[in-house]
Amino acid sequence: MDRERLTHLQQLEAESIHIIREVAAEFENPVMMYSIGKDSSVMLHLARKAFYPGKIPFPLLHVDTDWKFKEMIKFRDETARKYGLDLIVHKNPDGLAMGINPFVHGSGKHTDIMKTEGLKQALNKYGFDAAFGGARRDEEKSRAKERVYSFRDKSHRWDPKNQRPELWRVYNSQVNKGESIRVFPLSNWTELDIWQYIYLENIDIVPLYFAAMRPVVERNGIKIMVDDERMPIGPEDEVKQELVRFRTLGCYPLTGAIESAATTLPEIIEEMLLTTSSERQGRLIDHDQAGSMEQKKRQGYF
């Protein structure tokens, strides 16, 4: 079918499926990062479509920091069982031994050790030469300038000044031994595209995306959900039950909730049409310092 006859979402879907199939054909040992969020759910759905009725020909990898929302872990395990996924879960053993804690050590150190170093450990351990990620260009300025095929050196570092041209949807997959590519099939999607596609395709997502009464503590203007007993509650903290949901998901101490009454997908989509703020405003790791996301990516972060 001609691209001109496809709807906007059908064009995005076709492009993403093309990228996923290209990587599966060109690389020896690809892996799909699975962070359990809405973008990962869409990417997994696209991968299942790309190889239907066969199984996805590569494993999924979740780098678990040990601080994800309980509902995320439950959803991850249920999804893996439901679709018979080859799911690898990796936790940085050094970070666990050191007792790295986002409340004690801060978001920067926690992210570096449990996420960046944990990811590099897993990629080295299993020898993956390509890794899919669900990042989109509309999320954040460093991601806006990153290619679909993002080259990484032997230390998994990204050099934004040394990117390969991608003309006419032709991607350069050549890497030397020890080098790798991070692949972003959802690069050209927007947050609104993601939500509309989830609605049209009836894709399961973590319930945290829907508004519900949840216990939250407000710190520095950000509502943090009290997800387990590890969260320190000081005498100045007031735990309130509020109607909130999450636009983005990560480690619960580093992810802010938003006030919302959206309990259905159409209501979330309507909310997205009216919002003027970034979905990542609630991710504390993006506010460590100016340009923090680009610095993290240079060091090997996804």
Curated annotation (Swiss-Prot):
Q: Which GO terms describe its biological process?
A: hydrogen sulfide biosynthetic process; sulfate assimilation
Q: Which UniProt keywords apply?
A: ATP-binding, Nucleotide-binding, Nucleotidyltransferase, Transferase
**InterPro entries assigned to the protein according to its UniProt record, in alphabetical order:** PAPS_reduct_dom (IPR002500), Rossmann-like_a/b/a_fold (IPR014729), SO4_adenylTrfase_ssu (IPR011784), Sulfate_adenylyltrnsfr_sub2 (IPR050128)
Q: CDD domains in the record, alphabetically?
A: Sulfate_adenylyltransferase_2 (cd23946)
| Membrane-crossing segments per the record | none
Q: What class of enzyme is it?
A: transferase
Its pathway, per UniProt, is: Sulfur metabolism; hydrogen sulfide biosynthesis; sulfite from sulfate: step 1/3
Instruction: Give one Pfam family.
Output: PAPS_reduct
Catalyzed reactions per annotation: sulfate + ATP + H(+) = adenosine 5'-phosphosulfate + diphosphate
Assembly information from the UniProt record = Heterodimer composed of CysD, the smaller subunit, and CysN.
Q: Which NCBIfam families match?
A: CysD, PRK05253.1, PRK12563.1
The UniProt family comment states:
Belongs to the PAPS reductase family. CysD subfamily.
User: What is the recorded function of this protein according to its Swiss-Prot or TrEMBL entry?
Assistant: With CysN forms the ATP sulfurylase (ATPS) that catalyzes the adenylation of sulfate producing adenosine 5'-phosphosulfate (APS) and diphosphate, the first enzymatic step in sulfur assimilation pathway. APS synthesis involves the formation of a high-energy phosphoric-sulfuric acid anhydride bond driven by GTP hydrolysis by CysN coupled to ATP hydrolysis by CysD.
Protein's name in the database = Sulfate adenylyltransferase subunit 2
- Species of origin: Aeromonas hydrophila subsp. hydrophila (strain ATCC 7966 / DSM 30187 / BCRC 13018 / CCUG 14551 / JCM 1027 / KCTC 2358 / NCIMB 9240 / NCTC 8049)
